[in-house]
Structures are given as structure tokens and as C-alpha cells.
């Protein structure tokens, strides 16, 4: 039986001061709203990379402050980065991304390195433990290879790291191990070497982008009883009107970028005509494949949490999907019965 997770998983990048330094009170209020509007247990997705461990530290501190029982929360910790002293004006690992943090971070992906990351995560979480473990962004780690030999070495590092995670699972230190990546093809490659309980796909299966090849891979994962979490459904805020798509600004002079901008304009117009909310429709599409049980959504605003919870339960009639297909916004070969 696949891992059982709720429809909504809360992303915790904002707790690590992604792009904006939030106050302790704002972070406290945000976490409080997660528990106010959700059924238990609440699932939180974090990583040692988020604010060089700050996100994990805040989670442990605020859960304790709120008196949350360990049985009422499930924490996912994506491993592969650990904190080190900050010896420069700003962090070196993602300059400009993490604001007002007191540590830097280094990558440490290997059989022993992933254990060090796990141990640090436990220390930062205090009395809580992460029960869902994974290697953080293995696609980016592989993409940094300078040649084929280096890529083979990096692949060996990742597989060795997963051997450590499998050992932790066998020892009862973790409930399940998985993988998260922006490039779903990396997940498919690693699936040949690793025994995953769950996968998290980012910027991959969305209303704007849902290639048939990926749909077939999702079918394959379902046949293996692998739980699937869909994330980054809005392409980094692009589908809510942001200037960035998949974390980079778009240039209308570039044909591929112009195509995405036109798609969004047409999508917004269609949603207006159909009197539906573009965000809610995008979330519903992200859950439309029967094998996808959960989506990971993030907000920095406590007053938006209730709307996120409502969005994962909102369904649309087949007529809405048919209308979007007729306008060329959804692949006509992709079948949606409801949702």
C-alpha cells in the first residue's frame, strides 16, 4: 500500500527567510494557522538548505511553543546541505536568496555526508524528528558534473546516500524515503537504483506543462505503489501573475518565453470567461491524475492558509476542462473525468 499522506503538504521555505526576512511572530502565526485549518497530522516539507537550517530550527521551536504533539506532525527533511559558519557578507550557497541568516551552507552528498545532514536536522528540530527523508535536488547535483566521469561519480554519491537512508528506514529512524526534483527525468533515472516510498515532482506536472511521457511515468510509479507529491504547481508564481517562471525572469523577445507568456494570458482570459479562479483550477489540475494524492503549497501569509486548504478540496465540472482543452490550454489527449 502506498504511503498515506493528506492532500495538502505545507512548504516551509519562508521559515528560512527566502527572499524576505520574516519576523518570529509572523512565522509563529503561519505555523499556528497550519494546525488551525488542517486535519491532523499536519505534514511540513523542509530542508537543511532552507536558510542554512533556519527553517528546521524555526519548525522545532514553534511546534514546541504551540504545544504540538509529535504524533500530530509529519516532517519531511530533504537532506544534502548542512550549515557552516558564515564568513562572508552573505551566504555563498545561493546568493541573494536567503535574507538575514546567520550561517552559510555546504553540500554534503555521500553515504556518510547524508548521515551528517540527518543528524544536524535532528539537532535543529529539537524534540521533533523528520520521518520522511530524501536527498535534496539530485537533478541539480548531477547537472553540475563537468564530464561523464564526474556525472558517474555524482550518481554513485546519490545512490550511496540513499543506501544510508534505506538503513535509517530499516532501523525505524524514518517512516519513508523518497526523492524530490525539478527534472522528473532524474527521478526516473534514480528509480532504477533506489527503492522509493514517495516522489515529489516540482515544476513538472502542471496545467501548463504535462507531457505524455511524464504521465506514463506517473502511471509506472503508481504500479509500484509509490506515493506521488506534486509541487511548484504555479511555476514559481508565474501562474499567479509573477514575473518569474521556474525561478527566472522571462524575456518576451525569446520565442520560448513569449509562448509561455501568451499561454498565461490565454489561461487567465479563459478562467475569467468560465468564472473560475486560475489558482484553484491549477491546483485541481495538479491533483487530476488519480495517482497523485498530495500537493505541496506554500504561502508566507498566515491569512492565506485557509484558502490553500480550501483549494485542494475544490472540484470543477468536466465542462471546465473541456473548455480549456478547446482553447488549446490542456493537452487534448490527457483525460480528466472530474476534479
Task: State each model region's role.
Residues 94-103, 148-151:
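A solvent-exposed, charged loop/short amphipathic helix patch at secondary-structure junctions
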Residues 2, 36, 63-70, 125-127, ...:
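Acidic (Asp/Glu)-rich catalytic clusters
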Residues 26, 119, 123, 130-131, ...:
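Beta/alpha (TIM)-barrel catalytic core signal, keyed to glycine-rich beta->alpha loops juxtaposed to Asp/Glu
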Residues 1-90:
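N-terminal binding-site loop/beta-alpha segment at the start of enzyme catalytic domains
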Residues 86-97, 242-247:
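Short, flexible, mixed-charge acidic loops at enzyme active sites
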Residues 13-25, 99-115:
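Active-site mouth loops of central-metabolism enzymes
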Residues 107-129:
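An active-site-proximal structural segment forming one wall of the substrate-binding cleft
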Amino acid at each position: 500500500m502506498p504511503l498515506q499522506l493528506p492532500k495538502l503538504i505545507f512548504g516551509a521555505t519562508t521559515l528560512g527567510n527566502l527572499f524576505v526576512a520574516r519576523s518570529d511572530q509572523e512565522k509563529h502565526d503561519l505555523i499556528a494557522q497550519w494546525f488551525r485549518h488542517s486535519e491532523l497530522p499536519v505534514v511540513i516539507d523542509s530542508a537543511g538548505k532552507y536558510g542554512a537550517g533556519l527553517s528546521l530550527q524555526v519548525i522545532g521551536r514553534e511546534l514546541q511553543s504551540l504545544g504540538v504533539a509529535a504524533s500530530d506532525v509529519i516532517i519531511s527533511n530533504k537532506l544534502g546541505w548542512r550549515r557552516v559558519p558564515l564568513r562572508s557578507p552573505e551566504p555563498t550557497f545561493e546568493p541573494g536568496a536567503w535574507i538575514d541568516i546567520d550561517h552559510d551552507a555546504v553540500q554534503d552528498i555521500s553515504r556518510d555526508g547524508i548521515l551528517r545532514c540527518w543528524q544536524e536536522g535532528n539537532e535543529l528540530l529539537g524534540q521533533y524528528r523528520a520521518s520522511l527523508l530524501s536527498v535534496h535536488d539530485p537533478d541539480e547535483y548531477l547537472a553540475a558534473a563537468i564530464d561523464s566521469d564526474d556525472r558517474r561519480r555524482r550518481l554513485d554519491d546519490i545512490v550511496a546516500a540513499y543506501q544510508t537512508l534505506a538503513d535509517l528506514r530499516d532501523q525505524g529512524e524514518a517512516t519513508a524515503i523518497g526523492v524530490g526534483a525539478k527534472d522528473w527525468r532524474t527521478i526516473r533515472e534514480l528509480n532504477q537504483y533506489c527503492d522509493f516510498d514517495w516522489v515529489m515532482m516540482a515544476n513538472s506536472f502542471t496545467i501548463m506543462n504535462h507531457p505524455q511521457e511524464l504521465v506514463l511515468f506517473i502511471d509506472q510509479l503508481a504500479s509500484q505503489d509509490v506515493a506521488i507529491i506534486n509541487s511548484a504547481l504555479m511555476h514559481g508564481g508565474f501562474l499567479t501573475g509573477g514575473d518569474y517562471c521556474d525561478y527566472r525572469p522571462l524575456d518576451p523577445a525569446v520565442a520560448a518565453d513569449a509562448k509561455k507568456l501568451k499561454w498565461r494570458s490565454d489561461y487567465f482570459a479563459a478562467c475569467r470567461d468560465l468564472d473560475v479562479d486560475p489558482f484553484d483550477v491549477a491546483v485541481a489540475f495538479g491533483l487530476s491524475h488519480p495517482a497523485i494524492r498530495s500537493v505541496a503549497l506554500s504561502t508566507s501569509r498566515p491569512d492565506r492558509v485557509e484558502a490553500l486548504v480550501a483549494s485542494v478540496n475544490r472540484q470543477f465540472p468536466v465542462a471546465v476542462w473541456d473548455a480549456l482543452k478547446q482553447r488549446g490550454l490542456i493537452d487534448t489527449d490527457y483525460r480528466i473525468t472530474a476534479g
